[in-house]
Design a protein with these regions (language model features):
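Trp/Phe/Arg-rich N-terminal binding region typifying the photolyase-homology
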Residues: 1-139, 143, 354, 445-450, ...
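Glycine/tryptophan-enriched, flexible segments
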Residues: 118-277, 386, 390-454
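Generic alpha-helical segment signature
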Residues: 30, 183, 209, 296-299
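Generic hydrophobic alpha-helical segments
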Residues: 59-62, 190, 306
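Short, contiguous clusters of charged residues that form electrostatic/catalytic patches at enzyme active sites
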Residues: 32-35, 57, 301-308, 441
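Active-site-proximal binding-pocket segments
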Residues: 211-398, 404
């Protein structure tokens, strides 16, 4: 039988379905990802139709225009996406059309893994054990060599009309230097990781200056590579990789799965504390402190390096994400939702599950969260994970000439050392906006006060 005609479509609801519109960094990525997807489909004989608007109305309009008799799409897992998908299936089936959604985003459906009592997991370790015992995820499917298009043209939005790219100012230069959006870029990133970095992953993944992490997160977030493609690639017989590195990386993939499990069972994960005790936490809103953190002017080099890496490249090393998030919520007592919103706007891998789950984990309000009294000392974190200061020197160049012993605590450097390095605290580099011991004491006092009001 001849192949059925296929019309590839990308529907950009941009918040019209009730979900969160993508932030600036993801909008930049989306523009380039769609350009590359369009080129890839063209090589296979098909075009890419772009439509912007609510999913239901947009798809039904296309169905009417094309007289389509079947609609297939990749399933969504954010609350608004789940609701929109459900409405779409109902509407299509009411019209006697075939409607199917597919699991292109996760290893397992978020509802599949349950505890012994049939409930959701709230702790990562047993979730990981259940996932590891659930068998191999399905094998990836190869892309078709050719697609049989519709004989007649179908109206499409012009990608440029969506205005996804920054213009005044164009802040995306660092993103262009750092990333290659699209499926080909994802495949190249995975190949480089497997061939050169995976064998150092378990030992080196916490050192931000060492390029041993996969940096696949933005490709995963945009559906350019799937977790089961990555999972099965780890089974390659020619990989000469120690078992501990393989397991550690698989566990990081499982953290992403766990985040979606949490989102599925906590639909307001980005706006409400999972641990409702934190509803009584006395955050201290301060626009000046928040801005200093956002702009990499906190006066703690490892924190500032992370925030500047984020602004320059749209990405931040995971260890530094934890340190920067802890600093905002515990040293500065700013609501985790402020930090989550900033990451949502500036990360190319901003994810509706991983982003809020990570912030709640650090803040202490989430499922399986780090204890609130675990307050990262940014100096010690820098000295442990960036011992020679290479990461700080890259993103905080005004400190580059400081000796290693002072690179994470410039305020302890003698005056002549600062002078020789061209550093003038309060002028060329900010004075620390809080003192660690005082900030830690204030955070613990706020936590004790919250516990006293329960």
């Amino acid at each position: 039988a001849p192949a059925r005609r296929v019309l590839p479509v990308f529907v950009f609801d941009d918040g019209a379905d009730g979900g969160r519109p993508p932030g600036g960094a993801r909008r930049w990525w989306l523009h380039h990802a769609l350009e590359r997807l369009r080129a890839s489909l063209s090589e296979r004989g098909a075009g890419l139709i772009l439509r912007r608007g609510p999913t239901l109305a947009t798809v039904l309009s296309l169905v009417e225009d094309t007289q389509a008799h079947a609609v297939y799409w990749n399933r969504r897992y954010d609350p608004a996406g789940i609701a929109a998908d459900s409405d779409l299936i109902t509407a299509l089936r009411e019209r006697a059309l075939e409607a199917k959604s597919f699991d292109g985003h996760l290893l397992h459906e978020p509802s599949r893994l349950t505890t012994g009592t049939g409930g959701p997991y709230k702790v990562y370790s047993p979730f990981w054990r259940a996932l590891a015992a659930s068998g191999e995820p399905r094998a990836p499917v190869a892309a078709p060599k050719a697609i049989r298009p519709l004989p007649e043209a179908v109206a499409s939005d012009a990608l440029e009309s969506w205005s996804l790219l920054p213009t005044a100012p164009d802040w995306a230069g660092g993103l262009r230097d750092a990333w290659t959006p699209g499926e080909a870029g994802a495949r190249q990133r995975l190949a480089e990781f497997l061939d050169a970095r995976l064998q150092h992953y378990a030992e080196g993944r916490d050192r931000p200056a060492d390029a041993v992490t996969s940096r696949l997160s933005p490709h995963l977030a945009h559906g350019e590579i799937t977790p089961f493609q990555i999972w099965h690639a780890l089974n390659r017989p020619d990989l000469d990789t120690p078992a501990r590195d393989l397991e550690k990386f698989r566990k990081e993939i499982a953290w992403r799965e766990f985040s979606y499990h949490l989102l599925f069972h906590n639909r307001d994960l980005a706006s409400q504390n999972v641990n409702r005790d934190f509803d009584g936490f006395a955050w201290r809103p301060d626009a000046g402190l928040l801005a200093a953190w956002q702009q990499g002017r906190a006066g703690y080099p490892i924190v500032d390096a992370g925030m500047r890496q984020l602004w320059r490249t749209g990405w931040m090393h995971n260890r530094v994400r934890m340190v920067a998030a802890s600093f905002l919520t515990k040293h500065l007592l700013q609501d985790w939702r402020e930090g989550e919103a900033w990451f949502w706007d500036t990360l190319v891998d901003a994810d509706p599950a991983s982003n809020p789950a990570g912030w709640q984990w650090v803040a202490g309000s989430g499922a399986d969260a780090a204890p609130y009294f675990r307050i990262f000392n940014p100096v010690l974190q820098g000295e442990r994970f960036d011992p020679d200061g290479a990461y700080v020197r890259d993103f905080v160049p005004e400190l580059a000439r400081l000796p290693n012993r002072y690179i994470h605590k410039p305020w302890q450097a003698p005056a002549d050392t600062l002078s020789e390095a061209g550093v003038k605290l309060g002028a060329t580099y900010p004075v620390a906006i809080v003192e660690h011991r005082k900030a830690r004491a204030a955070a613990l006092a706020a936590y004790d006060a919250m516990k006293g009001t329960r």
